[in-house]
Amino acid sequence: MKTTRKYSSNWIHKLETREHWLSYWHQIKLMEGHVEQKDTLVEIGIGSGFTSNYLRSKKVDVLTVDIDKEKSPDIVSDATNFKPDKNYDHFCAFEVFEHMDFDEMGSIIDNIKENINKNIFISVPIFKKTPISLELKIKSFWKSITIATPKTKIIDPHHHWELNYKDYSEKRLLN
């Protein structure tokens, strides 16, 4: 059975939002203290390339894998078909698994963990309230306000699922 991939590379040609930059910060923070110079790391789903470029600037040997050749990954491959040809210290997939069927995530991680010596880092979106940001600027006064409204459905058309949406619980994710 061939599954549908929901992704788009259109967003990588635009400037990122504050929330997207915060996401990068959280990705790096998650790896802080675990990933060191000269470590090897596989990144599946490279997005804009920020994380891999940052890690390379810190002398981490990064192998990038993405389904979208326009993003110029080291290897063009669907995550379900990628099998590392050697062992790596770390693996990361940030905001990737929600773009495929939930059940595929387990087989991908099982496939990868055989070749990872240290850590697997993953992040997925959490189904929560939708933030509405307002920015007010009057002369020298500036104020940013965020208001959260209840979210009733997945808004991103490229997501199959999000954590805590319907039966996609943390418990199910960790099993």
Predicted regions and their residues:
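Conserved N-terminal segment of class I S-adenosyl-L-methionine
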Residues: 1-92, 106-109, 115, 152-171, ...
